[in-house]
């Protein structure tokens, strides 16, 4: 801590600095809570400003006012002069405007009152400030923390340019800030105290508009502007009040004689009037089709109104919600009670805000049993997607008004609701009634307190289409997943299966257990997790899901919207959903109303569905066909739904298509799934307790893996195929599961390292195609190794053969994706330097000469027994080694600098030790060691050369690595251009790229700006040529 009299400060607590001084924040040595600002002025600067400093000290001692910064002490040390002044904890007005942008008229009036009070003191003592600007107007909060505007104290500071200027006196010194200088000051004319009034006018204008009234690029341009324009008229916004506009026009007069004087300024009506009277908020008089963007700016006081405080708004809401209306109100009229209530509770800060009547609120609702008398048409209800249905309050008489962008969807919704209401009765024959319930559930699906009460069963309506009015996507009906009534049975492998679910028809309404069809093929059963809303069995449920699941519907009349009585329930698919577009792949496999409990035997799984897109068609085309083994139910001949797999045999295609209709319903937008190239079988383990984070694939295999209970027909075992979808790392074994209903949920966010079995994909997705491990797929024992015939083909390309195992693996996310920018920039720089040094090392190897070429040259020279030829050959070799040594030394220097940079960045925490960083640092270290080794070897070989060839010392000193690299790059480009001219275009692109990389690295190590500019121009020309080559190649 630095000591200044009774005060102390730390040089780290820098507040700001000016042209002559530096300001620190300090405190009293005994009273540590007394904060001060210590202004340090170096005596070296006092030669020209000593007089100004004396004036500032004298003026500050004389001025004692709450709106002027106080001077506590003056201390003179051998090298500096310290002024201990009052500390303002709110910063300056410039910072305040930077944060707020503009200020309201009420705030401007509060600030201007205090500025005027300070100017009154200055004017009474004949002092002109001459440097009034936002940076010299400080803000201080009384409670040492930011509060409302009324708690801000304005203080004028920095009287370094102030001087005594009594009446009838003029000054001619040019000082201050140009944008806030009066025109007479910047034009070097005589001026008086009215110059401060101009500065105050510019400050007020900036508070109102956000920028000074007159600006220019330089003081000279501003001076020329003032000289050319005899009359100046600032652009004042239209919504400005008349008093403030008059004040600004009076202060911003170019001619000081026409400018407002101090007495008129102190007694101006804008300062004398109170705050703008706030009007009570009024309800909206009518519905508006659109809101104008300038509606707020058209009101003079709308711009300056602040939002109501939270306690006031809570008080308004409590009183408005305490007395609900008895009858349906007319929204175009306002009752006297509501107007009086709002006027009582309206705050002065709620000007130009509109309070919507409480009967529109969606937070409170009451359920109304809809009978024959109170039933309305279904198009009067606004349907919202959610866990529960919106409840119609008894006072919502008006029809909902759709959003303009959703008119088509809304019309489609009305038609669907109308057709639904008139489509007939439910299973029991009770008429359908239109009850739509407002959502009372939390985002996780739990009921909120005060939830809607149950509706009688005879009035409950079954709405079979999932509707959404808040999305711009096309409407797509999607029924809920049908499940099987609660039963306990044994699967084909002997594993017990427990179920706690209700069977629902395609419209989502509960179906009595006695009338629920038992449509299963393999005896497997779908499960449903119990939800808290199951206690209301007669309530309609609307769920908003990312992708609509496939609904295995039941055959029979009354269970679907299709006009054909024998067709199963409708299957909705959204045409805008694309394969892979969902943010989570697990959303395709699992759709549950509540989060799935790990290890629970009642986890809900919706059948897997691939949307109808081009990508999905390609995926379905990869799935082969198998013949199903039928298993009749005990109570009828209708086939059971197969939750495990759908096996289609080529010779029995027609029979399989007929059976598939019982499993997959007709899609509204895509047609029959049986018309596709194949079916997607699904296998699921209902009793699995594996963790959700386990990286295991989803194996889809025929039932033969369970011991032949559902074995395929004869002759099909050898040709059976399966599809394996994997994300992340593969398992250790490629063996099929031991149970037909085993379904292992994959982790879709796995980006970790692979296990000992190796990763199928490192950085990009690819497809693994191979043959099954044995003639009977799934017959290999657990722990068996993967099939040796697996092979990889590029992801997205058609595999050469559909024989065997097909694996789709998504690309893993690189670690650097989630890193900070400093990490990625440093890593990019390290990679560039690594590639650059590798290119330099290639050039260095070329400089040394090829050993084969040297051998051929020796054999050639052996014919000519000439001593001169031997000397020239030896000299060229030694000279090449000199160039090699220089290049190796430069490469070692660059590699060492890169390694030091990486070490420093890792220590500072800016560079994370990721896999990519470790790899590049390892490569840099290896190259560095290699360069050091080569430097040692070349130095030993060149010792004799350096000792014998002293006359070449000057030439050797002129050899620089930068020059060698530049010449090599130029030669490389020239040779590539020459080859291009002769149509020898084999590797010219590679050479161009290498030359551009050399120049890029060279621009990073050069120091001379001219050299850097030349290298940059050369590199740009190479890049243009590369671009032209790529364009011509693409055209061909």
Swiss-Prot record:
Reaction equation(s) it catalyzes: L-seryl-[protein] + ATP = O-phospho-L-seryl-[protein] + ADP + H(+); L-threonyl-[protein] + ATP = O-phospho-L-threonyl-[protein] + ADP + H(+)
CDD domains: STKc_ULK2
Compositional bias (Low complexity): 335-348
Region feature CTD-like region, mapped onto this chain: 812-1036
Membrane topology of this protein: Peripheral membrane protein
Domain Protein kinase: start-end pairs: 9-271
Region (Disordered): 319-348, 418-460, 491-522, 540-588, 656-695
Modified positions (Phosphoserine) in chain numbering: 430, 771, 780
An annotated Gene Ontology molecular function: protein serine kinase activity
Subcellular location: Cytoplasmic vesicle membrane
Record note on what altering residue 39 to R does: Decreased kinase activity and decreased autophosphorylation
UniProt entry keywords in alphabetical sequence: ATP-binding, Autophagy, Cytoplasmic vesicle, Kinase, Membrane, Neurogenesis, Nucleotide-binding, Phosphoprotein, Serine/threonine-protein kinase, Transferase
Main subcellular localisation: membrane
Post-translational modification: Autophosphorylated. In response to nutrient limitation, probably phosphorylated and activated by AMPK, leading to activate autophagy.
Transport recorded as keyword: no
Pfam families per UniProt: ATG1-like_MIT1, ATG1-like_MIT2, Pkinase
The keyword Kinase appears for this protein: yes
EC top class, as a word: transferase
Active-site residues annotated for this sequence: 131
Feature: compositional bias, Polar residues: 418-428, 504-521, 659-679
GO biological process: autophagosome assembly; autophagy; axon extension; axon guidance; collateral sprouting; mitophagy; negative regulation of collateral sprouting; piecemeal microautophagy of the nucleus
Function in brief: Serine/threonine-protein kinase involved in autophagy in response to starvation. Acts upstream of phosphatidylinositol 3-kinase PIK3C3 to regulate the formation of autophagophores, the precursors of autophagosomes. Part of regulatory feedback loops in autophagy: acts both as a downstream effector and a negative regulator of mammalian target of rapamycin complex 1 (mTORC1) via interaction with RPTOR. Activated via phosphorylation by AMPK, also acts as a negative regulator of AMPK through phosphorylation of the AMPK subunits PRKAA1, PRKAB2 and PRKAG1.
Domain notes: The CTD-like region mediates membrane-binding and incorporation into large protein complexes.
Protein name: Serine/threonine-protein kinase ULK2
Organism classification: Eukaryota, Metazoa, Chordata, Craniata, Vertebrata
